[in-house]
């Protein structure tokens, strides 16, 4: 069973402000942001299926500013516009809009199809979705899923109870290069659900 969390789609824009320091940094920034976009879209394509069309990501402006280390005098819209230009050859023309402090990034069908065709589904995500969608599974099977993957990748898994934010059990890997996300897994009478956050987003909750 899947539920969408409003913070889930927050895009990490960290380092984007460094575009002013030269082309190399700008390209590096574009790749970092592009990866977060493609990871999020690919995840939702696998979770809910994809039969064409556009997909939208929503996030609050303060999260973008925090991730960018931008102060109130720096232009968030200009930074986003520069990024859109950089990724246009792959993701198509992104449509960005804002209502007050809530931003929407719409990825066109061209970009969504590119992501579906070019971005492989991570092994961990495949394994986790199988566990989550299998009736009767519990947190113990989730724990085994992360532990098995950690052993295969020669790292360790960290598990914490997120009582403060009521996000269930939080799983992450000691080596972030294995997987840079935090997985918040909840178990109730309806089964298992999860939300995936970047580490920065989770720490900011």
Walk through the language-model features, giving the residues of each.
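Charge-enriched amphipathic alpha-helical scaffolds
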Residues: 65-66, 71-94
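A cross-family detector of function-defining hotspots
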Residues: 147-183
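Charged low-complexity interaction tracts in eukaryotic proteins
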Residues: 88-118
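Short glycine-rich, basic-tinged beta-strand/loop micro-motifs
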Residues: 50-71, 124-137
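Short, positively charged and aromatic/hydrophobic N-terminal segments
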Residues: 3, 10-20, 24
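Intrinsically disordered, low-complexity regulatory segments enriched in Ser/Thr/Pro
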Residues: 177-205
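Negatively charged, low-complexity tracts enriched in Asp/Glu with abundant Ser/Thr
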Residues: 125-161
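Positively charged, polyanion-binding regions of nucleic-acid-associated proteins
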Residues: 28-56
């Amino acid at each position: 069973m899947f539920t969408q969390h409003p913070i889930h789609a927050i895009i990490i824009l960290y380092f984007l402000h460094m575009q002013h320091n030269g082309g190399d940094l700008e390209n590096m920034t574009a790749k970092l942001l592009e990866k977060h976009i493609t990871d999020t879209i690919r995840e939702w394509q696998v979770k809910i299926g994809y039969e064409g069309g556009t997909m939208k990501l929503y996030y609050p402006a303060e999260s973008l500013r925090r991730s960018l280390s931008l102060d109130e005098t720096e232009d968030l819209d200009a930074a986003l516009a520069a990024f859109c230009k950089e990724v246009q050859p792959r993701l198509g023309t992104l449509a960005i809009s804002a209502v007050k402090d809530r931003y929407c990034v719409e990825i066109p069908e061209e970009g969504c199809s590119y992501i579906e065709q070019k971005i492989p589904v991570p092994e961990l995500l495949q394994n986790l979705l199988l566990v989550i969608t299998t009736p009767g599974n519990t947190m113990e099977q989730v724990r085994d899923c992360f532990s098995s993957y950690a052993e295969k990748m020669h790292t360790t898994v960290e598990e914490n109870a997120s009582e403060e934010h009521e996000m269930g059990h939080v799983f992450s890997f000691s080596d972030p290069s294995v997987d840079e996300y935090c997985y918040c897994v909840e178990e109730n009478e309806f089964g298992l659900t999860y939300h995936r956050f970047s580490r920065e987003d989770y720490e900011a909750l």
